[in-house]
Amino acid sequence: APEFPPYIVPIRAGRKVPPFPEAGVIVVADSLLASRPELLDDIIAWGPQCALFDEAHRASTWAGKRATADRNLSLSVSGLSVPMTGTPFKANPVEVTNILALSGHLGPVFGGASEFIERYATKDRFGGWMPKRKMLPDLERQLTAHCWVRRNKQDVLKQLPPKLRTTRVVDIDRKGFAQAHEALYEKIGLWVDEMLENGVEITQEDIKVYAKTHIEIITPLRAAAGVAKIPAAIEIVKDWLQATTETGPDGSKVYTRPLVVWVHHSPVMEALKAAIPEDMAGIGFIDGGTPEHKRQPEADKLQNGEIGVIFCSIMAAGFGITLTRSSDVIFIETDWTPANISQAEDRVHRIGQTETCMITTLLAVDTLDAHMRAILRNKGKDLNVLMPGADNNVTVMTAHLNEAAGQYEILTQEDRELEKDFKSVPDIIERIVTEIVLKRTSLPRAA
């Protein structure tokens, strides 16, 4: 652990709390504040004059223990309370409510939590929060005028080279995806049959409730799409290594153009590890099973030229590590949240990068890939209003065959229909459930 001067006191999990300085700084994880109320009480009794909350978006759930502990600490300080984050919004205005409470602006500027939420958010047909799009420009104006000091990445890191995005459609063996599809339909069918056997006439409202409360059932279908893309991804990686690996003067391998490959689901990472040929050398992994203290050392193998490809989990390696020796990124899978994708991209596109970064997303037809991109486009549009100039358009292509004409992405009519119909995960589930119910009953189609 690093050494600190006596006036800086870090509090670490699993260790005895050291004496507080008469005057100085206490550094503590918000997870400890949430899990140890007596520690929070002791810090409040210490009488801090100001409080800084790093990564404040981690406490975006108003009633959560972390958010409640942060607010209690914020209310106790006599001076400034400053929340800091690069991602205040992930999808809707409700997520910033607690951050505004920490900064002291929620009441004076917006009249409190209830008034803020009523003004800027509404509930969708599944009961989830979504923005009132007409009010987003007003929210951005209020935040800029009264609440936040905000700088975009390109304004701060002007020396960074461009980050370009493109897609690549790959052929897949549909067997595994079809099996997951059938399993999903069978699971939903059991619910439908049970309802019908109990004499329940299934309404559209019943379907909405089911969709809202069973979001997890879509995960195996997403993972199956990722697994189905693995053979194509491995061929790409093999070709990449063959084209970019040279032999140095001492006979060692030199990886001239390292590659970062991202996945999201654990089953996809496990299937990837199992499918990689035994003779494929020069590769590394960072996933949920990699201890946090070993993640950057694993990344350093790529940074130091020891490996030519690293396979990473978005949630395990999408933040806090540096992979700037690479400027090429492939996503076998992505995420529902634009910020999680751009954070993963920025493991290569950050201070120290000197090359143009090329981000390639692998897509498979007749899977959920198109639906995911529709949802991401919708979220990106809202986030662009709230945070102009931020990196929210993770599906917008900036490298395309028509680049010379200034046309980076061609959206088909089908893409636009998907964007209209699918704004959240429950929308996808509702469509599937409705299809199954229609096959078993005479439920009228929704308008």
Annotate each predicted stretch with a short phrase.
Residues 1-12, 106:
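Conserved helix-turn-beta segment of the N-terminal RecA-like "Helicase ATP-binding" lobe
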Residues 15-23, 30-47:
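Conserved helix/coil segment N-terminal to the catalytic DExD/H
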Residues 35-36, 91-93, 269-273, 296, ...:
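SF2 helicase motor core recognition
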Residues 49-53, 67-154, 353-356:
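Conserved P-loop NTPase motor "coupling/switch" region that bridges the ATPase
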Residues 58-73, 338-339:
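Substrate-gripping "pore-loop 1 plus following alpha2 helix"
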Residues 154-275:
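Conserved helicase/translocase motor-coupling segment
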Residues 280-317:
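Conserved helicase ATPase core of P-loop NTP-dependent helicases/translocases
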Residues 336-345, 349-440:
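A conserved SF2-helicase RecA2
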